[in-house]
Amino acid sequence: FPSSYLITGTEGDNLPFDPLKIMVEEAHNRGLTFEAWLNPYRVRARTGKALCSDNPAQKYINSGSDAVYQTANGGIFYNPGSREAIDLIVNGVREIVRNYDVDAIHFDDYFYATTDSSIDSALYAANGGGKSLAAWRRQNVNTMVREVYAAVKAEKQSVRFGISPQGNTKANYDTLYADVATWLGNAGYVDYICPQIYYGFNNATCPYSSVLTEFNGMIKVSGIDLY
């Protein structure tokens, strides 16, 4: 992957230093663990800085590949239904664990960026296997999560893999197609979750204590932690 525009202002610049290497070393020097926080599918959320020619997403766009989709506001995302996109994400995680002394790989709560059926209609027609679109999309995310977990453990057993799903469990399942119950109910998906429960105790829709109890109740496998 090319260097981020956030470092120099231009994506793909050659850097005289390795920011991730420095961050990991400085964290460990101070007795801190270092978790690499990633958005697995999101290239950009909206119209912004241009992608460099070496960015895999730009190559997919140029070739007309279904490994990416674009949203009306200029967002660019890897398509969870694309085998090519899954491999890219898994190999990217593998590269981090292999080359850096990170303590964990940690995914943010963004999975499918839209419920629009047009973003993967051809992939669904070819690979849906009789499942509903929603069930097929959840299967795609589950496949990626499971393969990332396996890649992390194959590289370094001590490195943990966790996810911070959205605090609203219904939105996770119905809108983001994130099947958190499967991740927590079966071995081989995650070591922990840290749900983003940004709600007060008296929230009318998602009161903190109730949501926390719901997430905790999904854990059916010994050794999976809830933070």
Mark where each language-model region is.
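Active-site-proximal loop/short-helix segments
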Residues: 43-56, 82, 99-134
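Conserved, mostly hydrophobic/aromatic
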Residues: 27, 89, 96, 105-108, ...
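Active-site-adjacent "subsite" loops/lids of carbohydrate-active enzymes
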Residues: 13-25, 35-36, 41-99
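Active-site beta-loop-alpha junctions enriched in small/polar residues
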Residues: 39-43, 107-112, 164-168, 198-200
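Catalytic domains of carbohydrate-active enzymes, especially glycoside hydrolases
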Residues: 1, 99-104, 186-193
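Aromatic-lined carbohydrate-binding/catalytic grooves of carbohydrate-active enzymes
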Residues: 1-15
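Glycoside hydrolase catalytic-domain groove-lining segments
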Residues: 116-227
